[in-house]
Amino acid sequence: AQEHNEASQEEEKEEKAPVPDTLDVLKEYAGLPLTRSIQLKDHTKSVCALGIDRSGARVASGSTDYDVKLWDFGGMASNLSPFKTFEPAENYPVIQLAFAPQSKNLLCLNAAPQPRVYDYDGNELAVYKKGDVFMRDMRHTTGHISDITCGMWHPLDDTHFMTGGS
């Protein structure tokens, strides 16, 4: 009975162990040099896309509120506001954001059939064409005919990216 009692006390001690702070876990296991954290609160709905430029100085956030917000850590005021907000495609939630590895252009994908590319300051550079939904043989149309679900830049060539859809 005493062995069972000691074992249950050890189990209780193990169960009551404190839950580690997320930042501490990241520092220890991922080797990330984290010293500070902040909360960027400006979207009105759930954030579902983040893009971080290679230097870590700029972040793009996208949301189901249809907006993309650009944050610049070097020039951010103490009120932690984004320096630019825009809606890439009216009434379509943002699905994915990605900065190009070299040029810093921003690939913006939302639940629409047309990918968009913006420059580092959020100015629209390109809107790619939609595929022809009435084409019988889909091999003869270019572009998506339905929602885009994913995409990424080519790792070595900033003039190319790939997208996938439903």
Region annotations inferred by a language model:
Residues A1-T44, C48-A49:
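Intrinsically disordered, low-complexity acidic/Ser/Thr/Pro-rich linker and tail segments
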Residues L26-D42, A77-P93, N123-I148:
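Inter-blade linker and blade-boundary elements of WD-repeat/beta-propeller domains
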Residues Q39-Y66:
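Beta-strand-rich domains and repeat architectures in extracellular enzymes and scaffolds
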Residues L50-G56, L97-S103, M152-D158:
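Loop/turn segments within WD40 beta-propeller blades
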Residues G62-D65, L109-A112, Y120, G164-S166:
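Conserved strand-to-loop turn within each blade of WD40 beta-propeller repeats
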